């Protein structure tokens, strides 16, 4: 799909939701903020899953709580509704610049 005009169209394009681990090498990023792509591109710096929750299992994605933990210690917690750019807007935005296919991860 391409050029999704609304959040409703974006929702139609979503299969489900999963967890991700998105790492950034801050030492690389501090050297030059333009190195964001390099700072995120090392082997093992992105993983997802292992579970995908289908969209019909989530009544309101904005009510999901996101918690970052390491060895049982909570580092951050917040709700999807407080994200700077929420999931439906992300899907709509990316559809303006690339064709989205079934199975794509955003």
Label every PLM stretch briefly.
Residues 8, 26-106:
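Catalytic-pocket segment enriched in acidic/His residues
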Residues 4-17, 28:
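N-terminal accessory regions of nucleic-acid-interacting proteins
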Residues 1:
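Catalytic and substrate-binding clefts that recognize carbohydrates or anionic sugar/phosphate headgroups
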């Amino acid at each position: 799909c391409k050029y999704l005009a609304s959040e409703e169209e974006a929702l139609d394009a979503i299969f489900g939701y999963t967890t991700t681990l998105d790492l950034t090498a801050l030492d690389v990023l501090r050297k030059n903020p333009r190195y964001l792509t390099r700072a995120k591109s090392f082997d093992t710096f992105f993983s997802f899953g292992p579970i995908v929750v289908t969209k019909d299992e989530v009544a309101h994605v904005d009510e999901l709580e996101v918690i970052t933990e390491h060895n049982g210690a909570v580092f951050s917690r917040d709700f999807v509704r407080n994200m700077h750019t929420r999931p439906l807007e992300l899907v709509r935005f990316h559809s303006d610049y690339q064709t989205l296919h079934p199975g794509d991860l955003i």
